[in-house]
Amino acid sequence: MKIEEYTEKLREAHFGELVGEILFREMAILFPDKAQDFQTLSIVEQLVGNALGELLERYQVRPVENARVIELTRHLLADIQPDDWNGWLHQFREVLKPFVQEFDDLYIHGPSSDLVQLRLLRDHERMLLYYVDLEIAGHDGLSVIQSFLESFNYRGEK
């Protein structure tokens, strides 16, 4: 993979994490029964976004402008029906699947110097998919998110 292609993929992934951080924070309001899940997911997105931000700095790549982050987040929020939890889960699952594969590929083909951050990116996306699968099956997925954070010795406020 050429460096230009690699850094563009990093930039896009970072953009997604910024959107996810805000989106999940707002979804805690839309789905009050799942507020803790979404607040914790927002922390995960922030953690991953910060790790990718470090890579963007290393490669001297400018992140996507905040206005685009806010614009996409608002657009995504407008499409969410707060009374359709299961519908949202199924839609989100379909959105996640290609990213799981993309981040697996990025981890496999990325520079060895970036493997810590790329593993975090890959593993968090897999965790999100597992969370969604548990919720679709009628199980509580919060423990999966919490275990993920604990595996990185996260000590922030929850």
Where are these regions (language model features)?
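Non-heme di-metal
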Residues: M1-K158
